[in-house]
């Protein structure tokens, strides 16, 4: 049995009621601390929950995917695989590029992970090819995380090579130095270089080979130490003209002598200033450009990082020529700010609605002012605690405060209503405040700690979802705690000073009409309650049916992971036939760009073609479509995507895959669509057998759309089958063959030009304009042991074959990723189940393993823990209530209200067409804390009436229900109106907020109607059970 403080003393509130000045100053201190905290808090879209992620890129121009895999990726993977704290390692080896993405455990600091990566790269250095142009480069960035800012650099007067050179040295480097920036990439590939295009016929006629030319260039351009002269009186540094800086100097280079006459490089090659890689290109809208993508470090604050870039840009662009134009095409922070602003507006709207409902019930301005002060004070004070906890102002913390509006006002309402009741009975305001606050103090404590108990399981959610909602749960808990403090200190003090019999009795036409309305409602409720109490078993059956119905709804409701947000940016992947060349792909890309830019919702477009570590193959292109602001377009992002895909379907020979960018990025690779499923095997042959079979099955499933795979094994290969015996007789080694082919077709970087500001490359290749395709192989010549020139065709046959365009690994084993979207009439849960069922029908061998990735894997994990999360919340609340009430039975009575909330929430979600996602589940957990307030207020007063007035249990619960009907209705409507702005949200980020509001409004409506009748019935049934149990024990003791 609980022990209440004497009602005459005021309990813990007495000190604050009797010392109004001290109480006022204490509240002013909380207010000032909150205001200062608000100004100091950073702003972000969501809490920072990124996995520590590092990307390692190695470029080896001319190398095939299998060479990149065996010579570069595999040695690095073996070293990385030994690092502690590594969660997942994925890699992609394509023509000339190896990209390894390392994702670490959430608990590992990024700086520690960086040190381990650097050590592993150092250990693998001796295992990598000796002719790598550059060592592996790592960046603290998640490649799947969309850039925080995209800039396009264009010029109508300067070549792109000069533009990129200036942008790289004057702009990109400076932006890279900004705190929070993880990587700045320049897409477009127009880095300056001297290109040497050999005329195969010319060097063959002179008896030379490409290797002769390469050796001559390499030896003629050096930059090394030469020493100095140190005499008796002065020192002299040695220097020489060992560097060649321009294409003209290289043209004059003598590569050999024949019959005493020099042969210059210009005689056998076209030497020109050009781009280091001619198979790269980027466009902004329809104009060729250098596209600068800025990505943040995992964990960096996106708003402050973007603000720093914006502040620096004017200074950086001033250093560029006037003909060079820098345009910000996308800035993710624009939508983040808009989303946060909309959420703040909804918070203010919730406060206004709650104050309005208070006035409607209390019909008294002084009585309305008191909770009108308590609510913002509790919310503002929360900001001070958020600063100390390193939180940010984001959508989730603002949602927590919006929901808290309905929570925090409850405490003030309960206190005011109880004090007002004593004043209306004729007691002085001070005595009424002491008596009312002392009487209600235990109820406030019960409400507060039982509600916080519901939030405790959220803090123990695992992985990234737990990190995501940690700020939400703690922010809400802090607001509730501050509210309890304010309600037990400031609220009764203000009641003692502001309320009086005259003010409470003073009525106008509105107050008289509303009073009569409430009296009629209470009278009707009393009549209905009396009838219900006469039919307890029928009422109990209704309560049990809600439990059964909630289970059924839980089973059948569509389930998802996280709402798809409209952030105004669409990422796209364009794919053409596997044999497509760079020129062919660039042409197709421009056709698609023309179609996309015609859409009225599209503001700008950037696209990129080529292989440079971000794009895996020549037959694919990356696109970023920037939409107009939400208030300037008619359709949401999903409708725009559907419209664009329909339009692009008319372009022959290409497939376009689109997905909206999201604030929450869990994946470690850029995917074609939203969700991923992987097949992993011990060999590529196993994948080549089973991937097509599974793809065929999945493409037939109605639960999936846009099904695609990164498995591309039909890339054209010209296999050079060398007769080793013939080659050996001529003194030609396989290294000679590889060198000759690399010199001709690999855009080989053979020398470096050093300047004061940068370094540039000399690129060697054959001029294949007159001998396109496989015919170019007939021009290859090698040097035999006797100095003669031997055609490649004399020792080798060319065989056409197929090979993968890229080779992907997951944790060092071959893997392919199947990407898919979910149609509008299905949920992610439906899609996951359909894939699992299809997998079972294939009877995959034991060496093939499957796994969902990214958000789909997180969905499975969250779904699996949801039931346990709700059970944990219920158990935690039972324990807290049991301790507070010193009873095993009363907590069960209180918890019997929960199924009604679940039924209401699930029905509302289904009617609204929303999925049961993580946000909606959080709403249901919060409902568990809200709806039990009704039962607590009823049971507290019923127990007090039984103990102090000697009422029977039936009379006590009946009177408690009538007495507490108005505050119950008031607090429920306050919580409902606090969630209503979220449910009706239409602005930026509304997709994230709406499921929480829908679930809470639906749950509150249904639970309010049902629990007013089921709770008193269950209270009486458990009272009978307790009496029966006691009598049984008593008989046993007598018999003993």
Curated annotation (Swiss-Prot):
Subunit: Part of a tripartite efflux system composed of MdtA, MdtB and MdtC. MdtB forms a heteromultimer with MdtC.
Regions that span the bilayer: 16-36, 347-367, 369-389, 396-416, 440-460, 472-492, 537-557, 863-883, 888-908, 911-931, 968-988, 998-1018
Gene that encodes the chain: mdtB
HAMAP family: MdtB (MF_01423)
Description of what induces expression: The mdtABC operon is transcriptionally activated by BaeR.
RNA-binding found in the keyword field: no
Cell compartment(s), UniProt: Cell inner membrane
Cited InterPro entries: AcrB_DN_DC_subdom (IPR027463), Acrflvin-R (IPR001036), Multidrug-R_MdtB (IPR022831)
Function: The MdtABC tripartite complex confers resistance against novobiocin and deoxycholate.
Gene Ontology CC: plasma membrane
Protein name: Multidrug resistance protein MdtB
GO MF annotation terms: xenobiotic transmembrane transporter activity
Membrane protein topology class: Multi-pass membrane protein
Family as reported in the entry's similarity comment: Belongs to the resistance-nodulation-cell division (RND) (TC 2.A.6) family. MdtB subfamily.
Phosphoprotein recorded as keyword: no
UniProt entry keywords in alphabetical sequence: Cell inner membrane, Cell membrane, Membrane, Transmembrane, Transmembrane helix, Transport
Top-rank taxon: Bacteria
């Amino acid at each position: 049995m609980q022990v209440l403080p004497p009602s005459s003393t005021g309990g813990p509130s007495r000190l604050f009621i009797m010392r109004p000045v001290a109480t006022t100053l204490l509240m002013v201190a909380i207010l000032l601390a909150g205001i200062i905290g608000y100004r100091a808090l950073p702003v972000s879209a969501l809490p920072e929950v990124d996995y520590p992620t590092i990307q390692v890129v190695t470029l080896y121009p001319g190398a095939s995917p299998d060479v990149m895999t065996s010579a570069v990726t595999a040695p690095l993977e073996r070293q990385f695989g030994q690092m502690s704290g590594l969660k997942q390692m994925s890699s992609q080896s394509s023509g000339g590029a190896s990209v390894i993405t390392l994702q670490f455990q959430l608990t590992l600091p990024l700086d520690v992970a960086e040190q381990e990566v650097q050590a592993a790269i150092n250990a693998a250095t001796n295992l990598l090819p000796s002719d790598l142009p550059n060592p592996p480069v790592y960046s603290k960035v998640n490649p799947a995380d969309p850039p925080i800012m995209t800039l396009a650099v264009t010029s109508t007067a300067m070549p792109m090579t000069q533009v990129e050179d200036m942008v790289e040295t004057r702009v990109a480097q400076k932006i890279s130095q900004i705190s929070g920036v993880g990587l700045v990439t320049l897409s477009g590939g127009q880095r300056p270089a001297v290109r040497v295009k050999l005329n195969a016929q010319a060097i063959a006629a002179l008896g030379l080979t490409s290797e002769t030319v390469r050796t001559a260039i390499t030896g003629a351009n050096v930059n090394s130490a030469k020493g100095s002269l140190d005499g008796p009186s002065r020192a002299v540094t040695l220097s020489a003209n060992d560097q060649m800086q321009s294409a003209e100097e290289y043209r004059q280079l003598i590569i050999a002598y024949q019959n005493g006459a020099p042969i210059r490089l210009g005689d056998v090659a076209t030497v020109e200033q050009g781009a280091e890689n001619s198979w790269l290109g980027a466009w902004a809208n329809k104009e060729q450009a250098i596209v600068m993508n800025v990505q943040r470090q995992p964990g960096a604050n996106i708003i402050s990082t973007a603000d720093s870039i914006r502040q620096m840009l004017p200074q950086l662009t001033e250093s560029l020529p006037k003909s060079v134009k820098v345009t910000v095409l996308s800035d993710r922070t624009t939508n983040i700010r808009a989303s946060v602003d909309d959420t703040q507006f909804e918070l203010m709207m919730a406060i206004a609605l709650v104050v309005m409902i208070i006035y409607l019930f209390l019909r008294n301005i002084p009585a309305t002012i008191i909770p009108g002060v308590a609510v913002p004070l509790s919310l503002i004070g929360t900001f001070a605690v958020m600063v100390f906890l390193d939180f940010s102002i984001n959508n989730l913390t603002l949602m927590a405060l919006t929901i808290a509006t309905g929570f925090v006002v409850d405490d003030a309402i309960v206190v005011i209503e109880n004090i007002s009741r004593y004043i209306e009975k004729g007691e002085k305001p001070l005595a009424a405040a002491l008596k009312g606050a002392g009487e209600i103090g235990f109820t406030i404590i019960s409400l507060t700690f039982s509600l916080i108990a519901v939030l405790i399981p959220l803090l123990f959610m695992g992985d990234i979802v737990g990190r995501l909602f940690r700020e939400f749960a703690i922010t809400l808990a802090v607001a509730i705690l501050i509210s309890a403090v304010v309600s037990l200190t400031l609220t009764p003090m203000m009641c003692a000073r502001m309320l009086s019999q005259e003010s409470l009795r003073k009525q106008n036409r509105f107050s008289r009409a509303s009073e009569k309305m409430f009296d009629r409602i209470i009278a009707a409720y009393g009549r209905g309650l009396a009838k219900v109490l006469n039919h307890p078993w029928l009422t109990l059956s209704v309560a049990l049916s809600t439990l059964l119905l909630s289970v059924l709804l839980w089973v059948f409701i569509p389930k998802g992971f996280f709402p798809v947000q409209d952030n105004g940016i669409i990422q796209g992947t364009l794919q053409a036939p596997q044999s497509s060349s760079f020129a062919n792909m660039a042409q197709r890309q421009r056709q698609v760009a023309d179609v996309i830019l015609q859409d009225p919702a599209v503001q700008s477009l950037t696209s990129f073609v080529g292989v440079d570590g971000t794009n895996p193959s020549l037959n694919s292109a990356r696109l970023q479509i920037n939409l107009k602001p939400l208030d300037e377009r008619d359709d949401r992002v999903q409708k725009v995507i559907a419209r664009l895909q329909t339009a692009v379907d008319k372009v022959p020979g290409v497939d376009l895959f689109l997905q909206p960018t999201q604030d929450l990025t869990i994946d470690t690779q850029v995917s074609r669509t939203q969700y991923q499923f992987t097949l992993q095997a011990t060999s590529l042959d196993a994948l080549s057998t089973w991937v097509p079979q599974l793809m065929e099955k999945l493409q037939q499933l109605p639960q999936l759309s846009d099904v695609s795979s990164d498995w591309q094994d039909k890339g054209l290969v010209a296999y050079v089958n060398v007769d080793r015996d013939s080659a050996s007789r001529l003194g030609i080694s396989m290294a000679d063959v590889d060198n000759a082919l690399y010199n001709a077709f690999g855009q080989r970087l053979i020398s470096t030009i050093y300047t004061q500001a940068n370094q540039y490359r000399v690129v060697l290749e054959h001029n294949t304009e007159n001998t396109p395709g496989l015919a170019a192989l007939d021009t290859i010549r090698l040097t035999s042991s006797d100095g003669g020139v031997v055609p490649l065709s004399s020792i080798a046959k060319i065989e056409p074959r197929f090979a993968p365009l890229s080779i992907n690994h997951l944790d060092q084993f071959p893997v392919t990723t199947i990407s898919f979207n979910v149609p509008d009439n299905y949920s992610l849960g439906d899609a996951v189940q359909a894939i699992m069922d299809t997998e079972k029908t294939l009877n995959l061998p034991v060496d093939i393993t499957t796994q969902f990735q990214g958000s789909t894997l997180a969905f499975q994990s969250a779904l699996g823990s949801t039931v346990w999360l709700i059970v944990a919340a219920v158990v935690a609340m039972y324990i807290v209530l049991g301790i507070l009430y010193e009873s095993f039975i009363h907590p069960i009575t209180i918890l019997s209200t929960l199924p009604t909330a679940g039924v209401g929430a699930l029905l509302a979600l289904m009617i609204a067409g929303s999925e049961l996602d993580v946000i909606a589940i959080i709403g249901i957990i919060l409902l568990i804390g809200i709806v039990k307030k009704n039962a607590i207020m009823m049971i507290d007063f019923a127990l007090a009436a039984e103990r102090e007035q000697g009422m029977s249990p039936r009379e006590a619960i009946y009177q408690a229900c009538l007495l507490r009907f108005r505050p119950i209705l008031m607090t429920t409507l306050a919580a409902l109106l606090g969630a209503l702005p979220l449910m009706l949200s239409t602005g930026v980020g509304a997709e994230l907020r709406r499921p929480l509001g829908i679930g809470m409004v639906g749950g509150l409506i249904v639970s309010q109607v049902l629990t007013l009748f089921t709770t008193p019935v269950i209270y009486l049934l458990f009272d009978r059970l307790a009496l029966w149990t006691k009598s049984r024990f008593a008989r046993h003791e007598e018999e003993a």
